[in-house]
Amino acid sequence: MVQAIVKREKWQTRRVVKPQPKAEKFSAIVRCDDFLLARFWSRRPYPRIDDVRARFIPGDILWVRETWQHTKVLNLHPTDANYGYVYRADGREWEDIEGWKWKPSIFMPKEACRLFLKIKNVRNERLQSISEADARAEGFDSVDSCFALWQKLNGIESLAANPWVWVYDFEVIPKP
């Protein structure tokens, strides 16, 4: 999905609402000082309201972690080297030479980050409510291909559970 962000083919993502509300109906997103709450309600078996806090709000800036590797960039002279980073998502094959190996995204330091995202909009919906337009905004050709990856990442039963998800629209911005 990093490749889709780099190519500007992805500008939306979904994350499971945690914890999942026990109340089944969505009421509203409530803006508090520096956070958002999704309010859910139900009348059976008794009146109930569940408030769930969004992890991000519009204006938040996130940095994208990706598989990366240190590299040595040689200028005019071999002794005049500086160190930089290369990214597996660029599709180039870099050799594992002298200990320069691919490192998992979870170990990426912020200084190595090249992609920063600014949250533009937050909403929530049931997973299976995704539209074809939203699937394209997620970087997919269709809803079916979006669901296929969802099941691969979250398990076969996750699609049938049809959880509430946060929908985050974002834009790529220069390094802040």
Task: Describe the residue ranges of each PLM region.
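Secondary-structure transition motif
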Residues: 1-176
